[in-house]
């Protein structure tokens, strides 16, 4: 006689033993949820590091970047002029303190040993604004920022470790830089950074009266808001300040400011750093977050479906328990107890996947953002408390929800009959059929979005890798050369050019302020078209040797190269890119035209040549009109650093040490950085987009796999429930083609419901990415159609395989199993 059951108990046969719990756990559900939740956990850990984790400053929300921008001219950076800094530092009630910082670098001598170091010119008030206590010593004193003040320096943590072996005795030591002796007064902690996180040292920026009248917009200003002040209040005040300043300016200056779209505003420091480190495209983070969110949704739908299938098989047992007095809560407790193994497996697996994913994403992002130079990032990406809490919380919530949904459908008498009696006039009950098709359509929708967006990003990467460079990087190397303050680059090149020609293996050599795909140094200017309305254009400008174009094989579209006399005699001549020539003069044939490139008081320059378009970075900057090249001796601006580019013959890499020695011996105090192949620079600049493509591709493949599995599982379960019907149809003469049509009909229902919505959402996301990705139009029909074809073929094949297997089976056996 069978033993009676109390409400909520299980039978001895099924048991509430550990072995029964292990058998009740579905490895497929554990694998799917662990993989999807782990990837999602890793992705949200990245978002936490970039978006939600505060910067390592006291009260970081009070920090803002003040910026002057010429919106109509294309100047949209994060810089100000010293004139504006001096005016705002004392005259703004909403700013508690402020400071500026600029990048510098060069040869630095400590105890007779030369180092190549990059640092910052910082006003002493910058450290008080950021308010990070020093690790050793103290900040730059206020007196050091005044004319005639002490020559002080603060070291960065990394340089302190490498140059002074991390010794506390470094405080008080002296080093020579730019012809001056500086005394070390402090060392900053490892986590400290300004706008340039890799700085080795900071020395005081002395603001003389003449410098405070400088209107050139090329300095970084960080300000701390007064307590209780919001950036919106400061921006309202800055707008009024801008209007008052223009009202007091001359009519010509006021007109020019209006034509250029001159504005002054403040941006939170966190937001500004995101734009700087992500190439002005922080929307890429939200794209990855969206993709990371879709995977768990697909896995959840699959898990719900599998759990429902298992629950339907136990529907009779649930009915018996309900008849014996078990409540819905008792059944839920029993199912949840059986799911503890599943829950533990999902939590453990998701945390393992999340830890591996965080490590992978951190390495990938650091490599993508810093390139071949490893520097400290202002954002912390680590697997910590947030990741563990997120993983455990989401796993607990999702597994509990799945069990509740399964119990809701299988534990209620009204729905129990619907799910148990699936044999109806057309094979399945309406509710079960609707639920099955709804699950399938949702999976199709999510997979369509991931596959189509993944293909769009992949197409962008292909466009990047096959973009026209405008120069030849093969067998070219470059190195940055930094000269002492008193040695001009023109003089340096005069000394070194003959020596380089004597070294075997060097076919061509050149010097320029910038080299393509090296983002360490850049120079931009706002110039105006010579004809009215004198439109403002934001352009790249650089001084180059006359061998620059031949060394990089940059083709001339019109005109000629600089002559030796023009390079020697300070002649005001320029070479323009083809796009800039069209914007300035309306034609590429601009040879002999003249204009004033650096303002109405600058010398009038003559155009002697026009060259083709050159790619300078992984994705083109839409706000930069073109490039203007000038000779090394062009009158006006000076620079103390540049890039030497060498065209080497095969096998000449053995002479790099001799080349470096020649460069360092050209003038006393010259510093030379590591030599890098141009092809290496190009690959490094593509790493961000390559990494995003790799992540998206992995997500898309996982989503496609989950969709195939989900559609196959749905169709297989339907086929299993209808196998007797299929056997009868086969027995009375139905052809395999008719059964295949029935299977394809189920797949078409899923496609009809899910594919259109998925395509619409994917096209919408592609439209948002149009300004972020390279070479992607709003609609790319070949790529979009390929994505649709992949989804359609995947769903139809997954729908057809289970029916094919049943159609090939022995129909008499199917009839007997169905009768049983």
Report the location of each language-model feature.
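Short, strongly hydrophobic transmembrane alpha-helices
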Residues: 23-50, 299, 344-349, 436-460, ...
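Membrane-helix entry/capping segments
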Residues: 2-27, 57-58, 242-294, 313, ...
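Membrane-proximal extracellular/periplasmic loop immediately following the first transmembrane helix
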Residues: 11, 44-48, 52-105, 217-222, ...
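Mid-to-C-terminal secondary-structure elements
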Residues: 119-142, 151-283, 363, 494-688
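Small-residue-rich transmembrane alpha-helices
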Residues: 45, 265, 304, 340-415, ...
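Interfacial "coupling" helices/loops that link adjacent transmembrane helices in transporter permeases
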Residues: 299-343, 709-751, 802, 809
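Alpha-helical transmembrane segments of multi-pass membrane proteins
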Residues: 20-25, 329, 333-346, 350, ...
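Alpha-helical transmembrane segments of integral membrane proteins
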Residues: 2-27, 272-277, 307-333, 337, ...
């Amino acid at each position: 006689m069978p033993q009676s059951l109390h409400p909520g108990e299980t039978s001895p046969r099924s048991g509430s033993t550990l072995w029964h719990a292990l058998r009740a756990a579905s490895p497929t559900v554990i694998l799917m949820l662990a993989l999807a939740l782990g990837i999602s956990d890793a992705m949200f850990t990245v978002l936490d590091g970039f978006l939600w984790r505060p910067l390592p400053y006291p009260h970081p929300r009070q920090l803002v970047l003040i910026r002057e921008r010429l919106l109509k001219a294309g100047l949209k950076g994060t810089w100000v002029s010293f004139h504006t800094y001096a005016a705002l530092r004392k005259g703004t009630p909403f700013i508690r303190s402020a400071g500026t910082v600029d990048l510098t670098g060069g040869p630095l001598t400590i105890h007779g040993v030369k180092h190549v170091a990059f640092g910052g010119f910082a006003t002493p008030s910058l450290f008080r604004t950021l308010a990070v206590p020093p690790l050793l010593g103290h900040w730059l004193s206020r007196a050091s920022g005044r004319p005639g003040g002490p020559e002080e320096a603060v070291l960065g943590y990394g340089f302190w470790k490498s140059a002074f072996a991390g010794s506390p005795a470094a405080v008080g030591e002296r080093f020579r830089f730019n012809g001056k002796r500086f005394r070390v007064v402090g060392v900053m902690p490892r986590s400290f950074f300004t706008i340039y996180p890799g700085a080795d040292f900071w020395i005081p920026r002395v603001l003389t009266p003449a410098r405070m009248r400088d209107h050139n917009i090329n300095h970084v200003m960080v300000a701390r808001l007064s307590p209780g002040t919001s950036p919106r209040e400061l921006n309202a005040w800055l707008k009024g300040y801008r209007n008052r300043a223009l009202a007091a300016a001359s009519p010509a200056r006021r007109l020019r400011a209006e034509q250029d779209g001159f504005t002054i505003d403040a941006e939170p420091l966190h937001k500004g750093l995101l734009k700087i480190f992500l190439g002005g495209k922080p929307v890429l983070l939200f794209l990855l977050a969206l993709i990371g969110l879709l995977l768990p949704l697909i896995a959840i739908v699959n898990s719900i479906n599998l759990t429902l299938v298992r629950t339907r098989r136990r529907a009779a047992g649930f009915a018996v328990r309900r008849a014996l007095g078990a409540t819905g809560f008792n059944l839920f407790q029993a199912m949840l107890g059986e799911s503890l193994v599943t829950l533990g497996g999902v939590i453990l697996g998701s945390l393992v996947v999340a830890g591996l994913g965080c490590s992978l994403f951190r390495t990938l992002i650091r490599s993508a953002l810093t390139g071949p130079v490893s520097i400290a990032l202002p954002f912390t990406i680590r697997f910590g408390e947030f990741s563990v809490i997120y993983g455990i919380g989401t796993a607990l919530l999702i597994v509990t929800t799945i069990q509740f949904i399964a119990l809701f459908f299988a534990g209620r008498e009204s729905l129990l009959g619907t799910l148990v009696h699936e044999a109806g006039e057309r094979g399945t009950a309406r509710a079960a059929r609707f639920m099955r098709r709804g699950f399938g359509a949702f999976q199709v929708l999510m997979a369509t979005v991931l596959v189509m967006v993944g293909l769009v990003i992949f197409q962008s990467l292909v466009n990047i890798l096959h973009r026209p460079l405008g120069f030849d990087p093969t067998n070219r190397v470059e190195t940055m050369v930094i000269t002492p303050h008193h040695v001009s680059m023109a003089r340096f090149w005069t000394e070194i050019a003959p020596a380089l020609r004597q070294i075997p293996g060097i076919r061509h050599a050149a010097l320029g302020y910038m080299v393509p795909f090296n983002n360490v140094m850049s120079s931009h200017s706002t110039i105006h078209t010579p004809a009215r309305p004198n439109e403002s254009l934001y352009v790249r400008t650089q001084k180059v040797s006359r061998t620059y174009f031949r060394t990089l094989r940059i083709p001339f579209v019109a005109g000629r190269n600089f002559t030796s006399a023009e390079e020697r005699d300070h002649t005001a001549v320029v070479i323009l890119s083809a796009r800039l020539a069209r914007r300035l003069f309306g034609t590429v044939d601009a040879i002999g035209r003249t204009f004033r490139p650096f303002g109405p008081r600058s010398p009038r320059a003559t155009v002697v040549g026009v060259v083709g378009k050159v790619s300078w970075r992984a994705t083109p900057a839409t706000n930069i009109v073109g490039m203007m090249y000038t000779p090394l001796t062009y009158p006006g601006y000076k620079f103390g650093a540049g890039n030497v580019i060498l065209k080497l013959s095969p096998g000449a890499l053995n002479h790099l040490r001799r080349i470096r020695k020649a460069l360092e011996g050209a003038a006393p105090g010259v510093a030379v950085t590591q030599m890098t192949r141009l092809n290496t620079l190009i690959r490094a600049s593509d790493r961000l987009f390559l990494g995003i493509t790799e992540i998206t591709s992995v997500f898309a493949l996982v989503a496609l796999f989950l969709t195939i599995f989900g559609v196959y599982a749905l169709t297989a379960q339907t086929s299993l429930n209808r196998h007797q019907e299929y056997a009868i149809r086969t027995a009375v003469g139905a052809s395999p083609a008719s059964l295949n049509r029935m299977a394809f009909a189920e797949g078409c229902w899923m496609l009809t419901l899910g594919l259109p919505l998925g395509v619409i959402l994917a096209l919408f996301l592609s439209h948002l990415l149009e300004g972020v990705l390279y070479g992607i139009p709003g609609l790319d029909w070949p790529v979009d159609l390929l994505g649709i074809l992949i989804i359609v073929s995947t769903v139809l094949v997954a729908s057809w395989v289970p029916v094919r297997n049943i159609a090939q089976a022995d129909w008499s056996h199917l009839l007997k199993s169905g009768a049983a």
